[in-house]
Amino acid sequence: MILKNLAIVIAWALPQMAGATVYNVTPADNLSATINKLKAGDELYLADGQYDLTTTLKINCSGDADHLITIAAAEGAKPIIDFRGEANGTNGITVGGQYLYIAGLTIRYAGKKGIWLEKAKYCTLERLDVYGCCDSGIQLRSGGHNTVVNCDSHENFDYQNNGGNADGFADKQGDACPGNVYIGCRAWGNSDDGWDSFQRETDGTPTVYINCITYNNGPATFDMSAHPRVLGVDAGLFADKSLSSIENGGNPNGFKLGGKGTVHNTELYRCLAIGHRSKGFDQNNNAGAMKIINCTAYANNINYGFGNDYAYTLDIHNCISLDAVDSDIKTHKSGTIIQSHNTWLSGFSTSDADFESLDIEGLLLAPRNVDGTLAETLLLHLKSGAENLIDKGMVYDKSNFEGDVIAGYVGYKGSAPDLGCYETDGTASAIIGITDDVRLINPNQPCYDLNGRRVDASYRGIVIQNGRKFFAK
């Protein structure tokens, strides 16, 4: 299977429940009141425009396994949920329900977290753009079995706390909660970390990252001279300060995977970490099992940092480390390190000359495609002459991963995988578009629903098999 860009687009294909209602709202309508009416199978679509809110938008309704509740942009619309008038310390959107599909929204300038899933389960967030908030852009705590697809969280800064909390994505599940899945997401320019999975004890279900990107989180300073909250409701916090250079005390890490010596099993596949003043991939005191396959770290201080004194396991293969400031990788003697086919090992090497482009700003943050997938660029793609990296990886299949949801994405082109997060044909990771021809489903291979759970032949709805989506009626 050749790996391509990821897309899970389900709002228009889900079967509507008998008796379900479709709601359409505009910025002039009471969005909160409409959400409070939603029941299993209902659909709510937001028209274009800016929805100005000064209090938390609470989503506590629940669908069920066969009838999601949809809250999404109307087809072709780009609704903006704007919280610039909200008091500092107040969350933007909170989600406490189950079986929700929330898609196509811009969420910005919240007084605390942009969108916070608290005890939410079996929810899907897709094509969200979250920025300018006073804490983490997207946070998940407790609950589990949630999927976050093709979302961006960037330039969030908890200036009221000197920058120590605002991550792009904060996966802080608590004790013994099932893992969540992140696919095709980007985090950049946040005051703390790109992803922070602090203090989660696994129940055996790993947190999974597929084709995700993190860049330049924890910058030393922020230019806040044009931020609407700084010029408005929070102006009093900035008296006599130079708005063009506000110091940041956050942690400049990319993927931060653990916390407080707890066991947090984690799998990363075809992920990319660039330009962090600390670590690109960070153990962060994780005492669990961490698996990193076909990832790339570029221009971080430490590209792969796993030097904490815990009895952890690091399983790392087919990875590229390029232009680390301090070191390619750090590990600790207390850990069990299983590694092969990485550029820092004997017999492997890499240099800038192996890559088509290193134009980070011009390519990494390119606008997404209309369906939310990442634009294909040449950034950190291997040149055809990079024979030291092409087809030189460890051969693997889906059995190498614990997370069921990865099964539909694993693959490579050629006799063996290339090293790094991109195959040489310029592709990255994939679900192919939906087909209604269920005759193509192989009855001898497993199928999964959109939350990564294995389903049998009686299941009705969208199923995934070998990276292809089918609509089983």
Locate the predicted segments by residue.
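C-terminal accessory segments
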Residues: 347-428
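Right-handed parallel beta-helix/beta-spiral solenoid domain characteristic of secreted/periplasmic
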Residues: 24-28, 48-54, 61-112, 157, ...
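Feature marks extracellular polysaccharide-active and adherence modules
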Residues: 47, 60, 72-74, 82, ...
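Extracellular beta-strand/beta-solenoid scaffold signature
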Residues: 54-60, 83-93, 109-116, 132-141, ...
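The right-handed parallel beta-helix/beta-solenoid scaffold, focusing on the short coil/turn
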Residues: 21, 42, 49, 55, ...
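C-terminal outer-membrane/trafficking sorting elements
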Residues: 430-473
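Acidic Gly/Asp/Thr-rich repetitive segments characteristic of extracellular carbohydrate-active
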Residues: 20-58, 418, 449-455
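Predominantly extracellular beta-rich ligand-binding scaffolds that present long acidic/polar faces
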Residues: 264-381
